[in-house]
Amino acid sequence: MTTATTALPTLAEPTASPLEIARLVALHSLCFVLPLSALGFFLTAPHGRAGALAWLLVAVTSLVADWKSAGEKRQPAATLPGWPFDSILYLLFTLQLVNLGLLVQMAATQNFWRMDSFVAWQLMGITSGYSGIVAAHELMHRKAPHRKALARILMGLVLYEHFFSEHLRGHHVRVGTPDDGASARFGERYQAFFRRTVPAQFRSAWRLEARRLGDEDMRWNDPRLLRSRVVHGLVLEWGLAIAIAVIFGWGAFVLWIGQAFVAVRLLECVNFFEHWGLERRGPRISPVDSWDTTSWFTLYTLVGLSRHADHHAYAARPYQQLRHCDESPKLPAGYFGMVLLALAMPQRFERLMTAELKRRQLGPFR
């Protein structure tokens, strides 16, 4: 793994007090807002039209809270116990499984054309993107095989298991270069990026696995592909989707595919603005190769994902230890707000991002 060329800020106190640990655990527990909201929705279904739509207010509230969020630049202690923060990830994994099970059950037992189905599609998709995939991203960077396995399961539940191979051995090696399909170019709009990055990342994952097996150019019918993780992921994720259709009906299948689509759209929207317009110089990664945000709400709701510069410098560093980097360019909003800008206000998105690149003399202004 490449390391940063610029010295990163020092940590806070060498050892956190029990009170500080409890404070951080409580703050990071904000990540349960979306999955617990989805759980509440499923457990109280069926709803009337207005009652169902009211559950989407959690997404609106999250957007407003993120937009109004104060900055968080405090550095973590050098030593924090791992188990309380790891427990948060395991609980997120469990909630994702439970919520998806309840989604399928609801689709199998209720009229598909109720407002509940639309809200379930949106709410579960948002939860899968902001909770399931975020937990998967953290777990796939851990060394323990069982944690990596949990990450692959979570990605398979949104029909995107190949992301595991591409992200670790593709994106983290090629970030900010023309060879990285997950890095957005200067001036690129999200819709164009999405159409480019999805097939590019799949091709990258396929080639990386083929290379691991001995031949990057092996044909599709090569028996060695039976050992490809990408092939395993395709078989398992689509096998599960087909089984859901057969056992629970077409309505459950449609909602399953629908929540996966929303989740992947969110994932790639985050990928879009995390490196938009940045051009890496040289073989080593530095803090200026990723966009950060100081949003307090994003930091704790998305388990540290927003400290992206430090993550790329030290990919195995657990989320509670990630540091704020003054050198990295700063997003004009938190992640929830940035998704809105990228999807609904592309001209404003480009204007604000370009201004920051000019101010820091990064990207095409270097």
Give the positions of each predicted feature.
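Cytosolic/stromal cytosol-facing helical appendages immediately following the last transmembrane segment
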Residues: T2-F41, A144-R147, A151-R152, G156-V230, ...
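Generic signature of intrinsically disordered, low-complexity, basic-rich segments
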Residues: M1, K73-R74
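Alpha-helical bilayer-embedded segments of polytopic membrane proteins, i.e.
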Residues: L19-K68, W83-A108, M115-G129, L225-C269
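Membrane-helix boundary/interface segments in integral membrane proteins
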Residues: R74-A77, E209-A210
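Intramembrane catalytic core of multi-pass membrane enzymes that act on lipidic substrates
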Residues: P76-V198
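Intrinsic disorder/low-complexity segments
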Residues: T5-L8, E13, W55, D66, ...
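Juxtamembrane membrane-interface segments at transmembrane alpha-helix termini
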Residues: L63-K73, S131-E138, E161-F164, L266-H275
